From Swiss-Prot:
It is found in: Cytoplasm. NCBIfam families: argC (TIGR01850). This is N-acetyl-gamma-glutamyl-phosphate reductase. InterPro entries: AGPR_AS, AGPR_type-1, NAD(P)-bd_dom_sf, NAGSA_dehydrogenase, Semialdehyde_DH_NAD-bd. SUPFAM superfamilies: Glyceraldehyde-3-phosphate dehydrogenase-like, C-terminal domain (SSF55347), NAD(P)-binding Rossmann-fold domains (SSF51735). It comes from Janthinobacterium sp. (strain Marseille). One of its GO terms (biological process) is L-arginine biosynthetic process. Pfam families: Semialdhyde_dh, Semialdhyde_dhC_1. Catalyzes the NADPH-dependent reduction of N-acetyl-5-glutamyl phosphate to yield N-acetyl-L-glutamate 5-semialdehyde. It is an enzyme of class 1 (oxidoreductase).
Length: 345
């Protein structure tokens, strides 16, 4: 059994990791840290885990993380890079759900996250954890930077088009919506029920920290210049993400051939569903699952292709993707512990 530790087990991605790993056939939950909740049984904070998780939260200095096989960091940015060197030296693998190991460009990281990077030497070996586009590197990795939720949808939605060279890569548009859980569990006025309920707004229009991450990865898929206009929105739901991606076609290609690009790219992917051309995927069709659904449109048969992408921001957009990476890193079936059917209604 793989001995797993979780640093930061009280946030939404932390409890989602607990939910997924509690029933994973190859995992033994060993340590869950929270300085504030030290000594509190996990099931007392999260009754949904009663009978499934019998651990108590422990302060980080008390947790025997170096005795684990892998440690997940479901923490604010900056925590993983402070602890990763010691864990790696002890032979422990690291999966960070924050941004510490996503960006190879240190200057971009420090600009957008407003903190210095304390172990830039580890960035060279850190694997970017978007499995469908980086599977081989993840298999061999000691440390993985889990992708952001928005970048996951943008990259998977645009990759087949960029790799085929059929769109103008310099003018990509991403219009993305996320549920409120994407903002985390911290107390914040903008996510209070009376503020977020019955409301819909854009944010980060002049610049968002997921833009440099997405651009860095998209540029690896094409030799062309890549430009991205990305606007995120907050919508009044708990879970779910819907990204509408626009690109101008530069090649004479029919709709069947466009569809074939995506079916060829993702036809064998267990967690990507390429829906029939012209479909309208709904966020609820992925709720509480590791599935991501994609559908293509071509308005008026013109030169614009529209890609619709939906996922659960806490699962494929965060914790589920991290578990998918863990499975690869330990030579397990990639789908282990992740074959949950989406919850409806």
């Amino acid at each position: 059994m793989i001995k797993v530790g979780i640093v930061g087990g009280t946030g939404y991605t932390g409890v989602e990791l607990l939910r997924l790993l509690a029933t994973h056939p190859e995992v033994k939950l060993t340590a869950i840290t929270s300085r504030k909740e030290d000594g509190l049984p996990v099931a007392d904070m999260f009754p949904s885990l009663r009978g499934r998780v019998d651990l108590a939260f422990s302060a980080p200095e008390k947790a025997k993380l170096t005795e684990c096989d892998v440690v997940f960091f479901a923490t604010p940015h900056g925590v993983a890079m402070a602890q990763a060197p010691e864990l790696l030296a002890a032979g422990v693998k690291v999966i960070d759900l924050a941004a510490d190991f996503r960006l190879q460009d240190i200057a971009a990281f420090e600009k957008w996250y407003k903190i210095p990077h304390s172990c830039p030497e580890l960035l060279k070996e850190a694997a970017y954890g978007l499995v469908e586009l980086n599977r081989d590197a993840i298999r061999k990795a000691r440390i993985v930077g889990n992708p952001g939720c928005y970048p996951t949808t943008m990259q998977l939605g645009l990759a087949p088009l960029l790799q085929a060279g059929v769109i103008d890569a310099s003018h990509l548009i991403a219009d993305c919506k996320s549920g409120v859980s994407g903002a985390g569990r911290k107390a914040e006025v903008a996510t209070l029920f009376s503020e977020a309920g019955d409301n819909f707004k854009a944010y980060g229009v002049s610049g968002h920290r997921h833009s440099p991450e997405t651009l860095e990865r998209l540029r690896l898929l094409t030799k062309d210049k890549v430009g991205l206009l990305f606007t995120p929105h907050l919508v009044p739901m708990i879970r779910g993400m819907h990204s509408t991606l626009y690109a101008r076609l530069t090649k004479d290609i029919d709709n069947a051939a466009l569809q074939a690009l995506f079916e060829k790219a993702y036809g064998n992917e267990p967690f990507i569903d390429v829906m029939p051309f012209g479909s309208h995927p709904e966020t609820r069709s992925t709720r509480a699952s590791n599935m991501l659904r994609i559908a293509l449109h071509r308005p008026d048969d013109g030169d614009t292709v529209v890609v619709l992408v939906v996922q659960d921001n806490l699962v494929k957009g965060a914790s589920g993707q991290a578990v998918q990476c863990m499975n690869l890193m330990f030579g397990l079936d990639e789908t282990a512990g992740l074959m949950h059917i989406p919850v409806l209604p």
